[in-house]
A protein has these predicted regions:
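N-terminal phosphate-binding or glycine-rich loops at protein starts, especially the Walker A/P-loop
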Residues: 1-81
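Phosphate/pyrophosphate-binding betaalpha-module
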Residues: 16, 163-204, 208
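Short glycine/serine/threonine-rich phosphate/pyrophosphate-binding segments
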Residues: 14-24, 45-46, 119-127, 138, ...
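Glycine-rich oxoanion-binding loops at beta->alpha junctions
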Residues: 52-141, 181-192
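C-terminal non-catalytic interaction/assembly regions of soluble proteins
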Residues: 285, 289-367
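Short, ordered loop/turn segments at secondary-structure junctions
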Residues: 10-13, 38-44, 115-116, 146-149, ...
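Accessory alpha-helical/coil subdomains and C-terminal extensions
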Residues: 35, 132, 140-145, 153-155, ...
């Protein structure tokens, strides 16, 4: 019996998403399932235009053909699947093997993403979400994302809808799995950029503070530090004082270290700093934008030590890199495993990598 699968990506992009989508579609095609791409995460299932879609088959195909002709007429000869879909004023469309054939090594997510929370306090749109899933006749949703995306998946599953999760976050800190898509590639980006910063720091006998992502976990910065030459790593799990950091820095100078690299996670809380992020307005999941801790730290240390100290924020560079071989392989395993669960009629699970094996855990474990 054929099944209709909707695929979406939520939250921040990460290396490995496009390959995972490709392998979901490829495996689903092999077993005779229909696959549909949902644009911009959960937002794509809340779009008002969905109610105008009467047929996910021939009706949609006609609209996409017209959209392609319009783009070509406007001399836009190179366009992605999402461009085609958006131009047709759609938020969901068929996703075939040919559509995703070149997605295997591409960075980001060609489906688009957002931080939309259908269950947001004060703006609960879960009823619309469920109605649209039913209108579209989607038997399963495969949601690729981190804690927020999996939380929505869990709540949707709890309401009786079939959801399979695939873990993604470059922070590498999602519960229920030993690996999340994008982590290894992001560590490689840290290594490459720290090596570049190291050359300049050495040339000018200066200290450089390199800020990485890592809201609640320092795993990314920690692994990045182990892959390259840094003098100090600061992570959210420990809140140092400026005085402690200054003491270590000065001690290294006394030991003959002429320059230094300090790696700091964005979520690190320096005890001397007021938590300026707490009063800021957050996204639909309540996440606020952090102050630039690396920049603040560099400025304060320069005043305290009378040394030349610079700062670099790697920020979104960590998300946007081409996936490395490891992330492509894991994307393959995760994507195939998701469809295999669907074949067995299993739902409410997240694909997991644990003890060296691909397995799955309840979505409740990922939140």
């Amino acid at each position: 019996m054929t099944k209709r699968i909707g695929i979406l990506t939520g939250g921040g992009d990460a290396p490995g998403l496009n390959p995972a989508i490709k392998y979901i579609v490829k495996k689903a095609s092999q077993v005779g399932y229909e696959t549909f791409g949902i644009t911009d995460g959960w937002k794509g299932l809340l779009e008002p235009g969905i109610e105008k879609i009467t047929d996910l088959g021939s009706d949609l195909q006609k609209r996409l053909e017209v959209s392609a002709m319009e783009l070509i007429k406007n001399r836009i000869h190179e366009f992605e699947w999402k461009d085609l879909v958006k131009n047709a004023r759609l938020s969901i469309a068929p996703l075939s093997k040919s559509d995703v054939s070149k997605w295997g090594k591409k960075p980001g997510t060609n489906l688009g993403s957002s931080r939309t929370n259908p269950f947001a306090k004060g703006n609960d749109r879960s009823k619309i979400l469920i109605e649209n899933i039913e209108k579209l006749g989607l038997d399963y949703i495969v949601a690729l994302g981190g804690e927020d995306t999996q939380t929505v998946g869990y709540r949707l599953s709890d309401l009786g809808k079939n959801v399979i999760g695939i873990p993604k976050t470059i922070d590498g800190d999602l519960p229920g799995t030993d690996y999340t898509l994008g982590f290894r590639t992001a560590v490689g980006v840290i290594k490459k950029n720290v090596e570049i910063a190291d050359g300049t720091a050495r040339s000018h006998n200066q200290t450089t503070v390199v800020e990485t992502m890592g809201r609640h976990s320092g795993l990314l910065a920690y692994e990045g530090a182990h892959s390259t030459n840094v003098g100090m790593v600061l992570i959210p799990e420990y809140s140092p004082s400026l005085e402690e950091i200054k003491t270590i820095l000065m001690r290294r100078k006394e030991q003959g270290v002429s320059y230094d690299i300090i790696l700091v996670s964005e979520g690190t809380k320096i005890r001397d700093y007021e938590d300026r992020s707490s009063a800021a307005k957050g996204d639909e999941f309540g996440h606020v934008k952090f102050d630039h801790v690396g920049q603040l730290l560099a400025s304060d240390l320069e005043d305290l030590t009378d040394q030349k100290i610079r700062s670099i924020s790697l920020g979104h560079l960590l998300r946007g890199a081409d996936p490395n071989g490891y992330d492509i392989d894991m994307a393959n395993h995760f994507g195939v495993a998701a469809v295999e669960l669907i074949e067995k009629g299993i739902s409410g699970r997240m694909i997991s990598y644990s003890d060296g094996k691909i397995t799955h855990v309840p979505l409740s474990r990922a939140i």
